[in-house]
């Protein structure tokens, strides 16, 4: 069973997404802010990270940059999640080190397709 680290500060989004992913066979571990997400990702054991980009304190952009700049080079695939679908955000997410990008509200079939593609590429 693949394990996903969900870094999301909004409780409603966190609960909804984690339940929907668990019903599809994923184990979901939650971090509620960027700092906790970085610490947990560095500890390892995750097959994929879903990173909200609008986090309080250390946002998802900087959290992703820190993970990718880590001397131990965190290579876990990261999908950026954002409610602010601005022009250039996808490119900005990829430049920060994300492997893919998705917008909120989450359309589960679209997100699952991205998750499955990234997990398949790391096998």
Label every model-predicted segment.
Residues 8:
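Conserved acidic carboxylate
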Residues 15-23:
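Charged docking surfaces used in two-component/phosphorelay signaling
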Residues 25-32, 40:
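Short hydrophobic/Thr-rich beta-strand motif most characteristic of the beta2 strand and flanking loop
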Residues 52, 82:
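Active-site residues of response regulator receiver
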Residues 56, 74, 86:
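The feature encodes the CheY-like receiver
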Residues 106-115:
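C-terminal output helix
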């Amino acid at each position: 069973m693949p394990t996903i680290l969900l870094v999301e500060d909004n409780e409603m989004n966190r609960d909804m997404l984690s339940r929907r992913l668990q019903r599809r066979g994923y184990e979901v571990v939650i971090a509620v802010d960027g700092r906790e997400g970085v610490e947990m990702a560095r500890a390892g054991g995750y097959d994929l990270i879903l990173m909200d980009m609008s986090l309080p304190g250390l946002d998802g952009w900087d959290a992703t940059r820190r993970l990718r700049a880590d001397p131990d080079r965190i290579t876990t695939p990261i999908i950026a999640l954002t409610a602010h679908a601005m022009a250039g955000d996808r490119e900005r997410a990829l430049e920060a080190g994300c492997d893919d990008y998705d917008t909120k509200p989450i359309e589960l079939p679209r997100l699952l397709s991205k998750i499955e593609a990234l997990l398949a590429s790391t096998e």
